[in-house]
Amino acid sequence: MNIKKILLSLFALAVLAPAQRIDAQGMPQMPKLPIDKEVRYGKLPNGLTYYIRHNELPKDRASFYIAQKVGSVQEEESQRGLAHFLEHMCFNGTQHFPGNRIVGFCESIGVKFGENLNAYTSTDETVYNINDVPVSATNVDSCLYILHDWADGLLLEESEIDKERGVIHEEWRMRSSGSMRIMERSLPKLYPESRYGERFPIGLMSVIDNFKPQELRNYYEKWYRPDLQGIIVVGDIDVDQIEQRIKDIFSPIKMPENAAAYEHYPVPDTKQPIYVVDKDKEQAAGVLQVFFKSDPLPDEIRGTMAQYQIKFMIELGCDVISARLNELTQKADCPFSAAGFSYDNYIVSKTKDALSVYILPKPGKDAEALNAVMQELVRVSQHGVTETELLRARDEYMSQIEKIYNNRDKQYNSFYIPQYVRHFLEGEPTPGIEVEYQIYQALTTQVPVAMLKQGIDEMFKENSTEENFVVFGMYPDKEGYAVPTADALKQAVEQAAKAKLEAYVDNVKNEPLVPVVPQKGDIVSEKPAAFGYTCWTLGNGAKVYFKKTDFNDSEVLLQATSFGGQYKVSEKDQINLDLFDMVMSSTGLGNFKSTELEKKLAGKQASCSPALGAVTDNLSGSSTPKDLRTLFELIYLRFQKPCDDVDAYNNLIALLKSQLENAEKLPEMAFSDSVKSTIYQHHPRYKTMKAADLDKASFERIKQIYQERFATGADFDFYFTGNFDEDSLRLFVETYIASMPAVAKREEMTNLNIKPAKGKVDNLFTRAMETPKANIVQVWWGDLPYTMKDGVVANALGEILSQRYLKSIREEGSMAYSVGAAGGAYFGKDQMYQLQIYCPVKPEKRDSALLLMKQGIMDIATKGVTAEELAKFQKFELKDYADKQKKNGYWQNLIESKNMWGFDEQTGYEAAISGLKSEDIQNFVKNHLLKDGNCITVSMLPADFKE
């Protein structure tokens, strides 16, 4: 795709706003859009950039980021992996926070490592974050000093570096999947004569094992410098004070003399097409990707009105093509199960973009799938897109923008921060949602659809299958799997390019979702309910609980529940039950098959899906206030007229079969299957779905089960939470819920009392694998009548063990990259507690890790927990609890749990957290875990592992 030609064609069509002038290369010149006026933006004399914004969601919280224009592409050959290694070292000792004090300080104020405190490294950037910090003068200053130390104060002590080598090794081991290995092997071919082909961020383990500490220090001094660093602070803070503190703290950092030149490494154009096909024994499925490479937006366009207009055109075009491809998948003879079109960076590089297609071919249909997808692109290049397609894509795009705009005063910090990170790293515009909304309003109201069509048609005529064209295939390496050759794929592309095709016909159903509006039923009573909800009892027996909130001006949540679920159906139907949610959510509704329904709902932000729990029938959905009627129409159709969409069913089964056939050989799948079967003693209700099981599935039986479970909403409790008009809600409830047929009595719960295995159970098994790795899951459990206190204690036990294992297994032992525990006490069909510990580990260290896992539990049984550990848990939980009070989903879950199970999870929760004592956790371990003695351990080792 030639961006320059598209810009000029759009300019000629007057799709772009009037340009100020045309430069010597014929490019339209436009002024840069100003940064959002609510953002304090500046640059220190040393070159460091900062962004500060006051925002009160969440209240009394702030987030702190530092973005570095440095990634693995800056590494020399002998440094491969140092950018990522350096990211790790930022948590292992700095000028103001030696040792592990960054993590210790953050967790002491309720900021959890991994969840709120983290970082990532890619080819072109490294970004660090401290999220959801409780604001106080001390906390804010400390977080700014953490950012300062990341920028210019790492200690990089040799002992800490040597410890971290093992951690990096375990991260590499954990991430070494089939797709990652294929990508690493293929990058040099996908990026000929480009540094991006040799700079996968995890690096080379030979470098990680052997680099000298001084080399890492030199890399840090060379690249972590003010002109490449951006500070972002967003939250409930005083902007003037933060700006002054940034100036005070960061201004002393000196720009290095004779600083190394910062380069944007190019991705050279390729005159000949690139075809890369690779396979791996642990690749889960066959995948094809097609790329039409192009240059990124030129600097003179980036950050201007034109960037929005180009983005609008490209995204509409991609949406139209994706919709066509999705429509094709519903045909029985379609050679692919799924496909989608998008525009983004070319794989891992910022200096080259690409239009790309993602294809999941059906087994043995790879060349046919590629040919079919390419034919659709050829069809667009020959005939263009239709105006009706564009209207739908435009309406859907605009409805998403409106949803954000209507909630513009209630956006969380997490909404703003990525915008400023991208502005700093890539020059993306950030004028604010008010300006963006005006831009898109103008594009949808002032630019005729015919003109949009003309511009998009031009865009798709620019794509060559020779120059800058790439086809990349990733395949399983297994007996009987036919991997296509590059020549076969090339022939498929060439044949498609020569095809003379008919124009696409856009078949649209214009009838209403609900052709005949049902006769209204009655609301027979109204009563106050718990947590500020109101309950309407309907004439047919249904109950509707609703709570109007001001948390999110663009959100209305729906949940509906009834006793029933899978346990009401024979285990002979287990495969049909396993498929139930996917099938009934992917088929159509009423008179609309799935693709017809998608077209009908374009521009509507409303959805509604059914699901079967073990003992409950469930319906969940959401809408904007504007689309509330549509949500109710979907509810009505879910109960009264599900669609007999056999094409959608057949496509889903074909997709699942191809995925499962390949996945069954994967070590991760074997481990997951073994964990489930060991815990539940091979009970057929907890059997992992296999490809062969799909032959026993029946769409007719699934529809029959659906009719049994969702014949009417009269025995359901419906919950609506969010920003709605109560009069409208009343009207829609009377029309679409109260009108459903009544039932003689509500169903009661059927509980089969399926419990985990009792006693001490060990399952150690081996599997062939490409990268030797071990996995451990350990589950402690027992029956326990539920109390809020036990729930808090079990949660605290999991969190504190996670911190201990992080220290003993990861930091001190270098045995694992990711290790943790999660505990809880549960009400519902079974009242019980459970503690689950997970640890992907170096095979040689499995026994040592198991000993440390057991030691962590025994230490708490004998000594309890420390005051510091307890305080960290309490800080985080109380902070998290306060934040939840402003979430619609939190309140909806509360009322649903209370009505269904009789437990109030709100009243007294803060007191239960604040009153928690070390002996509570100690006694829980002694009196439940150790006394009950139910401990299930599942471990997987490589087949060729020798002690």
Where are these regions (language model features)?
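Bacterial Sec-dependent N-terminal signal peptides
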Residues: 1-25
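Proteolytic maturation boundary segments
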Residues: 22-52, 238-312, 317-322, 326, ...
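M16 family metallopeptidases and their MPP-like homologs
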Residues: 51-53, 58-75, 82-83, 100-149, ...
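Active-site recognition of the HExxH zinc-binding catalytic motif
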Residues: 80-88, 92, 574-582, 795, ...
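Metal-associated gating/positioning segment near the N- to mid-region
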Residues: 89-101
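Hydrophobic, small-residue-rich alpha-helical packing segments that form membrane-like cores
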Residues: 160-228, 232-234, 239-246, 255-264, ...
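Internal metal/ion-chelating core segments
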Residues: 210, 214-242, 683, 696-735
